[in-house]
Amino acid sequence: MILLDNETAVALPKFISAQKLLEDKFILELLPRNNDKNNEKIRKTKRTTIELTIGGDIACFVKPHSDFVCDTIVRGIVPKRHNGLESPTVFVLITDNKFDFYNITETADKKYRILDKALERIIVKRVFTIHQLAHFLIIDLEKEIAKKYKSKLVIITGDFFLSDPQISKEDKDWLYPQMIKAIKKVKDSIILVFSPTTLSNLVNYG
């Protein structure tokens, strides 16, 4: 894991059609939360399948379980034949203190047996302020993920510092729309946000 500091299907042979379906899609299965009523019964019957496409809407998963977060990140580099995205790298942008590096390596090692690949191809960058985050998203995001790392999957953790009481409402109201506009410009990657709260202008799940 690299840490950074600051036409119609029937007209085509079936195997080509299947490959095309896999090419730009990433399927995630969202389980009910642990605190749902009658949880055991719900877990057996109620699951949400989400199909994400490169250049599509930006999904925000609210209060996701750590296992879901880590599995999603690792599956970004897993081959398509094993329900992964087969991205050259996965870029993870951390804006909070709740990111579990150990769980990612555990998932890569024990579940998928690709620990070495995960350590090499999962790129992690941490930012500490809303201004650092805004600068990276607005100025550097596209060139970093498209040109340098060629990431088909980009993960952003946290709520863009919107819950930080030390940041003025004026700064939040000014910077947040610009950051969302910047990430929506990215057309060659799937961008997912894992946030403790729902976020405006994104497709929220959970």
Label for each model-derived stretch:
Residues 1-110, 114:
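The Walker A/P-loop phosphate-binding site
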Residues 165-174, 201-205:
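Short, flexible/disordered intra-domain loops and linkers
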Residues 88-165:
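Conserved inter-motif catalytic segment of the P-loop NTP-binding fold
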Residues 182-206:
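Phosphate-binding/switch region of NTP-binding enzymes
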Residues 60, 153-157, 192:
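Structural motif
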